């Protein structure tokens, strides 16, 4: 496809339609947390977390380039992906907000790598920042996994068709 043809295709896709179609695919919801070199904690909610590689163990998430939380996490050079349970919608909303103190009143502990692990999560994956790639209006952030743990058998929080819920096996 030529560059001109690719541009025509790209501009012909309505962003709302694109979002509506991709909303048919359920995603897990995570809180990515970090502590910067000055000891200030930051975090953000993401619905774009995925595994990348088993060997070496790599994971990824895709923050919006306009995010105010991502630069703080990037500055830390390490982060923890907290897989939220279906009982943690409030935590999700807190980490999706512009609130500067997302950890106020929240129970957490620090990983061996120094990133916050939120109490009540289904699992957590602690990472060093491996690489960052620009991709349209987002970044692709790759983390090198240092440690990971399942914390509970609760259902993970899912986002599907614009709403939140849990998982029930059929």
UniProtKB/Swiss-Prot annotation:
Transmembrane segments: none annotated. SMART domains: Flavin_Reduct (SM00903). This is Flavin reductase. Gene3D superfamilies: Electron Transport, Fmn-binding Protein, Chain A. Optimum temperature is 30-35 degrees Celsius. Has a half-life of about 80 minutes at 25 degrees Celsius. NAD(+) binds at residues 51, 138, 159-162. Coiled coil: none annotated. The keyword Flavoprotein applies. Catalyzes the reduction of FMN, and to a lesser extent, FAD, using NADH as an electron donor. Is able to provide the FMNH(2) required for the Baeyer-Villiger oxidations catalyzed by 2,5-diketocamphane monooxygenases and 3,6-diketocamphane monooxygenase. NADPH acts as a very poor cosubstrate. Homodimer. Likely forms a loose transient complex with monooxygenases for which it provides FMNH(2). GO terms for molecular function: FMN binding; FMN reductase (NADH) activity; riboflavin reductase (NADPH) activity. Optimum pH is 7.5 in Tris/HCl buffer. Keywords: FAD, Flavoprotein, FMN, NAD, Oxidoreductase. It catalyses: FMNH2 + NAD(+) = FMN + NADH + 2 H(+); FADH2 + NAD(+) = FAD + NADH + 2 H(+). InterPro entries: Flavin_Rdtase-like_dom, NADH-dep_flavin_reductase, Split_barrel_FMN-bd. Belongs to the non-flavoprotein flavin reductase family. Its EC number is 1.5.1.37, 1.5.1.42. Pfam families: Flavin_Reduct. It is an enzyme of class 1 (oxidoreductase). Induction: By (+)-camphor.
